[in-house]
Amino acid sequence: MKVALIHSRDDVAGCTIRRHIEQCLDDAHGSANGRTYEFVEVGGRLINAEGVDATLDVNLVIFLSRHSSVNPVPVLTVHATGNFGAAELGGSPRTLAPAAPAMMQATLRALARYCPEGYRVSYEVTHHGPTGLSHPSFFVEIGSTEKEWVDPVAGRAVAEAVLGADPAGAVPLIGIGGTHYAPRETAIALSSRGAFGHIASSRLQVALLDRELVQAMVVQSRAVAAYIDRKAVLPGDVSRISAILDELGIPRLSETEITSLGHLAWEAYREVRALAATVGPQTRCFIHALEGTGPLVLVSLDPVLLSEAKRCDESALVQRFGPLPVAHLATEDNVLLPQFVAFERNSSKIINDLNTLCVKIIRNRESTATENDYLVIRKVRFDPQKARELGVPAGPAYRQLAAGQAVEYDGQIITPDRVSVATETRIHIPGLENYS
């Protein structure tokens, strides 16, 4: 890969970063991570560098720049370029440049590794030019005052991050919502395969998004999905933008869905989502140890078995899905469903593994018996009607009896067994006698 590193001679932070990159490249004999680099120096502000890459024979452009803020804090940032509205800071109105989500994420993660003490690392939303670019590009910046712009420690950190960025398994996304420093998108990119290209902020940019701009975000980011920070975006805007994404055929992923992608290839994940949609239009899917290729199928558990296991310990149940090569499904409100997705070749074993998991959780919490292929769950619960028939008034005595404690009322000892009712649930599980 050939990379152009562009800075302005009038930008002290850009000069600082270039100097440290040159030092690092001297140590690495001119290349790093299989990439070769070409330095390009321009005059004036980089935000006005329209067409600067038109004659460059490269695959990627990285702008080395300073970052300024009305509330200055030491920060290292990356972001794509473009304008959702007026071109107040270079470029053209309502125009987005080609982004480089995978390299942006890799650089962000490398910045986090090398970040000096006292600095923080984040994306920024798309907010300035240049827009007239031919190659995928992004800015990497040191902020936010001259003290940081000339800081050799920050300059070295950015240099090592640019050269050490190593994209792997990135899933390119667009981000909608949040503040200027895109906190949720930053957290997602640092903890998952989610790699953002263009990002729009809640306060100034989301209201500007129409079909044309959303489509431009997707195309210029080469995004396969979108993330909406629902806590930061007004409900009306969420609905409006969601409708646009539906028209464009772009899926929306929640933060949990992105962080649970695991190592599954994106096309396989799309197939998982397609199977989930046959269960219900808003069904969510959560990937566990599912990876590889092959035909995917839905497998189903007995809904009563799953319900009983959930009631016993839902947290442990979901946690123990982790090592299994499955995706579990849930409603939009995160209610666990009895359908799972697995590779067809594993489906019989997966059903047995899931049955075994549920049975173990139930046996750990309930009184059970095995009768041939039936799991029998016996429960004894407090019956308020029986207590009333014995004259026990509602109140503390009810709570004691429900807790399995005898009470004295009107000269008689009333034991829990006198005010209890026994129930029995029978669940047919083929091969149960062989389960451990």
UniProtKB/Swiss-Prot annotation:
SUPFAM superfamilies per UniProt: AF0625-like (SSF142535)
Cofactor note: Binds 2 Zn(2+) ions per subunit.
UniProt GO MF annotations: D-aminoacyl-tRNA deacylase activity; zinc ion binding
InterPro entries: Deacylase_DtdA_archaea (IPR018033), DtdA (IPR007508)
Coiled coil: none
The reaction(s) this protein catalyses: a D-aminoacyl-tRNA + H2O = a tRNA + a D-alpha-amino acid + H(+); glycyl-tRNA(Ala) + H2O = tRNA(Ala) + glycine + H(+)
Highest taxon, organism lineage: Archaea
Metal-binding in keyword set: yes
Any one of the GO BP annotations: D-amino acid catabolic process
Cofactor requirement: Zn(2+)
Family named by the database record: Belongs to the DtdA deacylase family.
Primary role: D-aminoacyl-tRNA deacylase with broad substrate specificity. By recycling D-aminoacyl-tRNA to D-amino acids and free tRNA molecules, this enzyme counteracts the toxicity associated with the formation of D-aminoacyl-tRNA entities in vivo.
PANTHER family documented for this protein: D-AMINOACYL-TRNA DEACYLASE
Name recorded for this polypeptide: D-aminoacyl-tRNA deacylase
Organism classification: Archaea, Methanobacteriati, Methanobacteriota, Stenosarchaea group, Methanomicrobia
